[in-house]
Amino acid sequence: MVLYTRPPRLSVSRETFFGRQTPVVIPVFKEGDSIKLPEGLPQDLESLLKESYNSKAVSPEPGSVAKLPYRGGLVVTAGCGAPGDLEGVRRGFAAASRQVVDSFEEAQLYLVGLDTVSSTEAVIGALLGAYRLEEFKNTRKRKLQQLWVYGGEPRLDYAQAVAEGVYLARDIANAPPHRLPPAKLAAAVEDLFSKFDNVDVEVFSYDRLLEEGFGGIVSVGMGSEEKPRLIIIKYRGGAGEPIALVGKAVVFDSGGINLKPSQGMTLMRADKAGGAAVVGAMWTAARLGIKASIIGLIPAVINVPSGSSYLPSDVIRMWDGTMVEITNTDAEGRLILADAISYAAKQLGAKTVIDLATLTGAIVVALGPLIAGLFTRSDGLARAFEEASRTTGEKIWRMPMEDEYAKSLTQPAQAGEIVNAAQRYGGAIFGALFLERFVHGKEFAHLDIAGPGIAFEAGSLAPPYWPEKGMAPGYGVRLLIEVLSRMARGGG
């Protein structure tokens, strides 16, 4: 079972817990030169909070927290910025959750006066802030198991399902490679979705991949004794042509024969973050019953050097027949994605193909550790992602699909039709243009999540609802769910 870490349970409470041993989290908002507090607080507590603000012990800045003794219990303030600032609310409640996760088994969220959207994001922030991956530790610190919600109008089922999907993606992305090689990942996904009557999981074995000509997936995985798999999750939530989500799952990426430098190589356990996000999004879509037909494809491989590894100058026949000349074995993600993308477009009849991949270091150089690069020629799809980004706080930036650059995929090829790695500059664009060749005219979006997917050196820039210590944050699950929901409603 992959879902090692479960979010705290959510329940509605009909009364406040002031004066009990259970801490109460209270949002604090900016209002001019003062603060705005939620309605219905006891007068003495309101006075305490205002006095604490005047003494600078309490701040409304997003993500700031303070712990105040009150009536023998504990109040935790959550700085949320201006009223209506969804990111501020997420940060505030996530930071507050971090303050109690290791000390209390339960906490109460005071959401009086918050609308449905804000109160839902507050709950999501608190759930995500409580994440701890402790499966591989002998001593576990997390105590928090229950969140009580008082007031507001949060969509608790939605918040719980989203948090489960993000936790699942985090667990997969951060799992040590020996614990989740391709075959075990495939088996875990089969087990995970077996509880749904409207979800089918099909796993292509190495022999089947070889027999059916998935040259990209097979070649990248040849160097490892743990052979590759293609995991296909089919969710029957609605009629019509399916939407395909394709996620890169390189369980560990050493670079292959073009070996990476040792510095930072341990982060390459998270080179499966795109595939992890697709698994998490498929889980959440099924839990929520999104009214759409959705297919998740996760090509899973290990890219390591050995006597049987694929080599620079090899020419690979891809599933759709394209002949690709290998110029860099560390540009492996696009090879496994291309096979899955073309299969989704041509064999599975997808109307739209969306892929997520920790694809290039170039996108991290361009956009830093918090922002994913969005590549699409569809203005409608771009709008859906941009609106979803504003709602979820998962940052994106639309990047160009420059046709002139596409020449660099073909001109250097000596034996093949195209190369897998073109010139040095504009690497993120070349990666997107390479993948676009395999969608066969279908609507397409490529998300290069190398920055936020792995959280490269995010440090103090990371929001408090990301895991601590630079772990992969499960980026993309919330973004995908919002986009899929909009598409199901006809808004994407």
Swiss-Prot record:
Alphabetical keyword list: Aminopeptidase, Cytoplasm, Hydrolase, Manganese, Metal-binding, Protease
Cofactor(s) listed: Mn(2+)
Sequence positions that bind Mn(2+) 1: D253, D330, E332
Active site residues according to the UniProt entry: K260, R334
EC id: 3.4.11.1, 3.4.11.10
Cofactor binding summary note: Binds 2 manganese ions per subunit.
Swiss-Prot/TrEMBL GO biological process terms: proteolysis
Homology family: Belongs to the peptidase M17 family.
The name this protein goes by in its record: Probable cytosol aminopeptidase
Species in which this protein is naturally found: Aeropyrum pernix (strain ATCC 700893 / DSM 11879 / JCM 9820 / NBRC 100138 / K1)
Lineage: Archaea, Thermoproteota, Thermoprotei, Desulfurococcales, Desulfurococcaceae
